[in-house]
């Protein structure tokens, strides 16, 4: 049996049989734009899904080889989202050996922290170590300061804590805080060991999947790009499509709409895989892009104290950053901080939002797409925020401890991250921008600081040089000569050397070229972040200060993370609950259902007709021109809602005010940028939405015009053409992912060549659409050749007259001395027919081709009339 054949595929019952929801809701189907849409009813919250049969999962695998085990695992996947997440985690971890090694070293690191901290606190007598006695009997060896049997005393003290036995005989030196620290760290260590032991079977399954099904050995995972893994997964899905019923989506659809839902399994492409892996992260990216989260510290202030607090740090309900907060009664808040996401706050948001929106299988809970549950959901989210605020206030010391042990990061990066962008691609993009960003921050003129630091460096260097020369002359001065009491030459050499290094580091290099605009343009090329207020001001101090907040010093990040643990309870208790209504509305209004994938964030679908700007030269606007699925014409005249894959969007007509004032487009062209970056990352992926293809074609056309002197599009318009993707005319110089960029240049040139060939084939085939008869010549030939052709046909005899068949037409064309190129066009016409004109390319350029064909038909009709007149005159002449 060949590889990839699913002989172990279990027998799958008809997806339309056994409907569980018969009689619940109407079965409605409609067709729009050539696609079938299904109006699905929402399962009530009280309805529990029936437990799935464990027969397949408990099916024995005795006697199967490694490949058969991998194939058995694939065809028995019941949670495709979770499986693909494990596939990606395995790829990101660089294979089973790297993953196991990293986890074992993490366990050893935790164990070392426990053992070393116990040794430092319990096993050293610091009174002897820091003794001021400077006699011959002074401390000189480690064993002189060690506490005898310190580990034994520590263990007996723990037994005393547990059993309440007498511990007077044991001199335990550890404090209660250290004891608590060790208990928590030990529990964390045990949890890590248990998690690692439970993950070993899944790692082995992933190893077999990569090695035997995908054909990727463990050594090649570190060098193989992710798009190649996606392509291999698509090939496996093509041969073994059983997991198309993943997460119960297809079964539920079939039960609701009947046999019409039966369709061949859809392929699993890069877009579907990214939507499944990043189903939850895409919502967070959209929330930050739409600025729906108020992460500033807001503390209510009593009215009697407002007169004693500066007005600059007070905020009223009317000044609230969110529309939902402006409806509250007049109230003053003490507000400070900015909308920055720290690690501790991100943990809480994931629990409060994602844990509330998604079920245990990672699917969107269906009550979030219904308007009638809105009030209950808003109240539930508010209670969730308040509860987590109280919980964070209680456990703040332990959260700080975990941050110190674990790690801490900057999380303003959610503003940089794009839809359907996997974490390793995002990290690679930021890593490429780091050196250039550092160069941009450092090169800004600091003349006054440089003058002072040059003076400090001169003074410190002079002292350090004198001490160094003296030490070289007499080495005994280095260790025994005390400049101040108990401070030798060695100490002051270290002090002056440090001052010299710091001061010289703050002086810019003399040969450095000052060009902040070029540096920031290069940074934007990778970060894809260029706010409108920055454009035209890249050289200003304002942009420099704003940018410096994004690339802060590590020590500042460290203190901000620790401070956020204290401030997070206030944000959760006072700032986020008023945002609950806007968040619930966002989840409902920006959630769509894609057949075969499930509910996803609408921006991640790349539906330009609903949520994007199809015109690459169109300036980005706010509410003007931004339309929703139910709110008027879509961008560039496209009818709202014509994706090639069936989608169902849930909105309600009972909230027209909210829908009317909702900005349906992403801020700062986030969806357009995400689409282009995803296309550049996966060149083989073809967008299924016609509006996406049209956007890409227009962007390429704009870049082509700019390269040929058509004039660049001004960056001030705010459109994509003026951005890093526009190619030529933006504030970023047309680099990056644009048609002039290094990433997409070859891909776009190939697309242009393919499109030119498609137009040539269309022209060739369209020239034969009008069938020639006894009075009709080839529409593209010269009139004189047409006249001679008619004479030959008239003299050809009765047998050839009136032969309107394709074969007869082909014979006449061949006997007229056609060239080889014309014979090839005749063969294409005969084999493929007229209908192929409307399916020329994979880029949905049918509208353009139809317009070209319409013009050709008119030319053919005119020449037909001319040929008819010539035929009559020639007939009279022959008579």
Curated annotation (Swiss-Prot):
Please list the residue ranges that the record marks as compositionally biased, kind Basic and acidic residues.
798-817
Please write the reaction equations for the catalytic activity of this protein. Answer: a 1,2-diacyl-sn-glycero-3-phosphocholine(in) = a 1,2-diacyl-sn-glycero-3-phosphocholine(out); a 1,2-diacyl-sn-glycero-3-phospho-L-serine(in) = a 1,2-diacyl-sn-glycero-3-phospho-L-serine(out); a 1,2-diacyl-sn-glycero-3-phosphoethanolamine(in) = a 1,2-diacyl-sn-glycero-3-phosphoethanolamine(out); a 1,2-diacyl-sn-glycero-3-phospho-(1D-myo-inositol-3-phosphate)(in) = a 1,2-diacyl-sn-glycero-3-phospho-(1D-myo-inositol-3-phosphate)(out)
Cite a GO CC annotation: autophagosome
Which residues lie within the region annotated Disordered?
1-56, 620-666, 763-825
Write out the biased-composition intervals (Low complexity). Answer: 632-657
Q: Which residues form a coiled coil?
A: none
- Membrane-embedded but not crossing: residue ranges: 385-405, 555-575
Q: Which parts pass through the membrane?
A: 104-124, 180-200, 455-475, 488-508
Glycosylation sites (chain numbering): 163, 166
Annotated membrane topology is: Multi-pass membrane protein
What is the recorded post-translational modification? Phosphorylated by ATG1. ATG1 phosphorylation is required for preautophagosome elongation.
Q: What is its main location?
A: membrane
Where along the chain is composition biased (Basic residues)? 27-39
Query: According to the lineage, what is the superkingdom?
Result: Eukaryota
Gene Ontology biological process: autophagy of mitochondrion; lipid transport; piecemeal microautophagy of the nucleus; protein localization to phagophore assembly site; reticulophagy
Question: Where is this protein localized, as stated in its record?
Answer: Preautophagosomal structure membrane; Cytoplasmic vesicle membrane; Golgi apparatus membrane; Endoplasmic reticulum membrane
Self-association and partners: Homotrimer; forms a homotrimer with a central pore that forms a path between the two membrane leaflets.
| Purpose of the protein | Phospholipid scramblase involved in autophagy and cytoplasm to vacuole transport (Cvt) vesicle formation. Cycles between the preautophagosomal structure/phagophore assembly site (PAS) and the cytoplasmic vesicle pool and supplies membrane for the growing autophagosome. Lipid scramblase activity plays a key role in preautophagosomal structure/phagophore assembly by distributing the phospholipids that arrive through ATG2 from the cytoplasmic to the luminal leaflet of the bilayer, thereby driving autophagosomal membrane expansion. Required for mitophagy.
Entry domain remark = Forms a homotrimer with a solvated central pore, which is connected laterally to the cytosol through the cavity within each protomer. Acts as a lipid scramblase that uses its central pore to function: the central pore opens laterally to accommodate lipid headgroups, thereby enabling lipid flipping and redistribution of lipids added to the outer leaflet of ATG9-containing vesicles, thereby enabling growth into autophagosomes.
Q: Which family does it belong to?
A: Belongs to the ATG9 family.
PANTHER family attached to this UniProt entry: APG9 AUTOPHAGY 9, AUTOPHAGY-RELATED PROTEIN 9
What is this protein called in UniProt?
A: Autophagy-related protein 9
Q: Look up and give the organism this protein is from.
A: Cryptococcus neoformans var. neoformans serotype D (strain B-3501A)
């Amino acid at each position: 049996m060949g590889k990839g054949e699913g002989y172990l595929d279990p027998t799958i019952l008809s997806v339309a049989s056994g409907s569980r929801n018969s009689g619940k809701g109407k079965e409605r189907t409609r067709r729009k734009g050539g696609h079938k849409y299904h109006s699905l009813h929402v399962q009530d919250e009280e309805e529990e899904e029936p437990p799935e049969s464990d027969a397949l999962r408990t099916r024995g695998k005795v006697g199967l080889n490694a490949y058969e085990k991998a194939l058995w695992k694939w065809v028995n996947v019941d949670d495709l989202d979770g499986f693909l997440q494990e596939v990606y985690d395995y790829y990101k971890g660089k294979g089973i050996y790297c993953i196991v090694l990293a986890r074992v070293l993490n366990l050893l690191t935790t164990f070392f922290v426990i053992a070393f901290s116990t040794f430092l606190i319990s096993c050293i007598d610091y009174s002897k170590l820091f003794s001021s006695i400077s006699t011959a009997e002074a401390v000189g060896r480690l064993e002189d300061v060690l506490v005898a049997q310190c580990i034994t005393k520590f263990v007996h003290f723990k037994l005393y804590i547990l059993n309440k036995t007498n511990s007077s005989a044991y001199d335990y030196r550890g404090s209660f805080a250290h004891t608590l620290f060790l208990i928590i760290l030990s529990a964390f260590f045990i949890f890590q060991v248990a998690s690692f032991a439970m993950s070993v079977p899944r790692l082995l399954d992933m190893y077999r999947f990569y090695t035997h099904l995908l054909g990727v050995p463990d050594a090649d995972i570190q060098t193989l790009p992710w798009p190649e893994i996606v392509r291999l997964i698509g090939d496996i899905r093509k041969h073994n499509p059983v997991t198309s019923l993943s997460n119960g989506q297809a079964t539920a659809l079939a039960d609701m709409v009947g046999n019409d839902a039966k369709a061949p399994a859809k392929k699993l492409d890069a877009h579907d895989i990214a939507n499944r892996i990043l189903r939850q992260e895409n919502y967070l990216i959209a929330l930050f892009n739409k600025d729906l989260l108020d992460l500033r510290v807001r503390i209510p202030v009593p009215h009697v104290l407002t007169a004693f607090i500066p007005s600059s740090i007070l905020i009223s309900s009317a000044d609230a950053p969110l529309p939902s907060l402006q409806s509250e009664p007049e109230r003053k808040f003490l507000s400070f901080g900015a909308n920055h996401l720290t690690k501790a706050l991100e943990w809480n948001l994931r629990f409060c939002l994602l844990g509330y929106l998604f079920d245990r299988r990672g699917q969107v809970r269906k009550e979030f797409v219904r308007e009638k549950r809105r009030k209950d959901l808003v109240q539930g989210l508010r209670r969730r925020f308040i509860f987590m605020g109280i919980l964070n206030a209680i456990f703040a010391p332990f959260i700080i401890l975990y941050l110190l042990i674990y790690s801490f990061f900057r999380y303003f990066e959610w503003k940089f991250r794009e839809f359907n962008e996997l974490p390793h691609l995002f990290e690679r993009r930021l890593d490429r921008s780091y050196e250039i960003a550092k160069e941009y921050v450092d090169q800004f003129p600091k003349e006054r600081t440089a003058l002072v630091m040059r003076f400090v460096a001169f003074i410190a260097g002079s002292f350090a040089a004198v001490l160094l020369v003296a030490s070289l002359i007499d080495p005994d001065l280095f260790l025994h000569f005390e400049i101040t009491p108990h401070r030798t030459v060695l100490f002051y050499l270290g002090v002056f050397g440090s001052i010299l290094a710091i001061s010289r580091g703050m002086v810019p290099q003399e040969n450095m070229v000052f060009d902040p605009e070029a540096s920031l343009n290069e940074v934007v090329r990778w970060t894809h972040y260029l706010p409108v207020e920055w454009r035209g001001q890249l050289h200003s101090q304002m942009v420099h200060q704003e940018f410096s907040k994004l690339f802060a010093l590590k020590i500042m990040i460290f203190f901000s993370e620790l401070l956020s643990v204290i401030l997070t309870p206030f944000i959760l208790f006072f700032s986020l609950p008023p945002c609950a209504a806007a968040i619930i509305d966002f989840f409902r209004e920006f959630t769509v259902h894609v057949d075969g994938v499930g509910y996803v964030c609408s921006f991640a679908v790349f539906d330009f007709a609903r949520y994007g700007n199809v015109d690459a030269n169109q300036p980005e606007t706010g509410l003007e021109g931004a339309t929703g699925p139910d709110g008027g014409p879509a961008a560039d005249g496209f009818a709202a809602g014509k994706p090639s894959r069936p989608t169902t969007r849930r909105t309600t007509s009972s909230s027209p005010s909210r829908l009317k004032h909702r900005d349906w487009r992403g801020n700062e062209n986030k969806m357009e940028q995400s689409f282009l970056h995803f296309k550049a990352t996966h060149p083989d992926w073809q967008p299924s939405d016609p509006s996406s293809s049209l956007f890409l074609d227009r962007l390429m056309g704009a870049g082509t015009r700019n390269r040929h002197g058509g004039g660049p599009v001004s960056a001030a318009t705010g459109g994509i053409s003026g951005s890093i993707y526009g190619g030529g005319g933006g504030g970023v110089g047309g680099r990056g992912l644009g048609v002039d960029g290094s990433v997409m240049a070859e891909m776009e040139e190939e697309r242009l060549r393919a499109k030119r060939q498609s137009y040539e084939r269309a022209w060739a085939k369209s020239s034969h659409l009008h069938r020639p008869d006894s009075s009709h010549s080839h529409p593209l030939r010269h009139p004189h050749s047409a006249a001679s052709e008619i004479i030959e046909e008239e003299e050809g005899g009765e047998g050839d007259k009136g032969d309107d068949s394709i074969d007869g037409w082909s014979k006449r064309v061949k006997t007229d001395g056609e060239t080889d190129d014309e014979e090839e066009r005749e063969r294409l016409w005969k084999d493929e027919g007229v209908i192929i004109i409307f399916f020329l390319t994979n880029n949905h350029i049918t509208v353009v081709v139809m317009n070209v064909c319409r013009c050709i038909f008119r030319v053919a009709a005119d020449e037909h009339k001319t040929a008819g007149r010539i035929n009559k005159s020639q007939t009279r002449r022959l008579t």
